[in-house]
Curated annotation (Swiss-Prot):
InterPro entries: Ribosome_recyc_fac, Ribosome_recyc_fac_dom, RRF_sf. It comes from Halalkalibacterium halodurans (strain ATCC BAA-125 / DSM 18197 / FERM 7344 / JCM 9153 / C-125). Belongs to the RRF family. One of its GO terms (molecular function) is ribosomal large subunit binding. Its main location: cytoplasm. GO terms for biological process: translational termination. Responsible for the release of ribosomes from messenger RNA at the termination of protein biosynthesis. May increase the efficiency of translation by recycling ribosomes from one round of translation to another. The lineage of its organism: Bacteria, Bacillati, Bacillota, Bacilli, Bacillales. This is Ribosome-recycling factor. Keywords: Cytoplasm, Protein biosynthesis. Coiled coil: none annotated. SUPFAM superfamilies: Ribosome recycling factor, RRF (SSF55194). It comes from the Bacteria. Pfam families: RRF.
């Protein structure tokens, strides 16, 4: 009984930390990363299509992204979508590929990005704590219904807390690593 509550909580906490990892990958840290362009959608034949479905994105150098569209006629649409995005990137094309040079980050922009990292990490921690609360509520309900003894409740509640501590630690480590990467000049 209590194992399924623990397993469910662990799965949900894992998803929360993975979501944080995806969110942090999208933040620009002065290095080129194809994940930076994940949120960009392109108006393609009347439909909003994710950029990564229209082109291959490669990183030939640390500060350069190369986008090679599958359909050459979509180059101007892709370029327009990148310019309209809030990433502050300037694409240039030579008719067959689009090149994006990633400019070095200013000190002010680095500080803004670290604030975003802290905010994302805090949201992930709140999600993990909410999962802990849900699990504990479920366990208390089961104890009230007679499915768990008082001792079992205490033991499993401690296990849920250990799980929470483990995932909060992972979140802190991810955030710290990203902040370090951003502040690196």
């Amino acid at each position: 009984m209590s194992k399924e509550v623990l397993n469910d909580a662990e799965q949900r906490m894992t998803k929360a930390t993975e979501a944080l990892g995806r969110e942090l990958a999208k933040l620009r840290a002065g290095r080129a990363n194809p994940a930076m362009l994940d949120r960009i959608t392109v108006e393609y034949y009347g439909a909003e299509t994710p950029l990564n479905q229209l082109a291959t994105i490669s990183v030939p150098e640390a500060r350069l992204l190369v986008i090679q569209p599958f359909d050459k006629s979509s180059i101007s649409d892709i370029e327009r979508a990148i310019q309209k995005s809030d990433l502050g990137l300037t694409p240039s094309n030579d008719g067959t590929v689009i090149r994006i040079t990633i400019p070095p980050l200013t000190e002010e922009r680095r500080r803004d990005l670290t604030k975003l990292v802290k905010k994302s990490a805090e949201e992930a921690k709140v999600a993990v704590r909410n999962i802990r609360r849900d699990a504990n509520d479920d366990l208390k309900k089961r104890q009230k219904d007679g499915e768990l003894t008082e001792d079992d409740l205490r033991r499993v509640t401690e296990d849920v807390q250990k799980l929470t501590d483990k995932y909060i630690e992972q979140i802190d480590q991810k955030a710290e690593a990203k902040e370090k990467e951003i502040m690196e000049v």
